[in-house]
């Protein structure tokens, strides 16, 4: 999100480092996988469940990435950077929880019925 990008920019500023923006091959792969789901599964509960699962893969990747950055910032004593990174980490965890609730509140059951 824009807020997350702003926080990364703040971390870079606080630490006084230059950041070269690069594309993340892993994230591009997850996005491509989502596109394949859309192209290969008809609209309906099964596709919805697959897309929720794909979105959770993205969130888990982001949680792992921000968790690692938080651990490094803590180890290095970068308290301002840690605060900003933790905020984003908590947002990612919250999004993952919402996706889990969406799947468990009927999305997976509807997909299972459709697949049966």
Regions found by a protein language model. Give the residues of each.
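Amphipathic alpha-helical hairpins
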Residues: 1-116
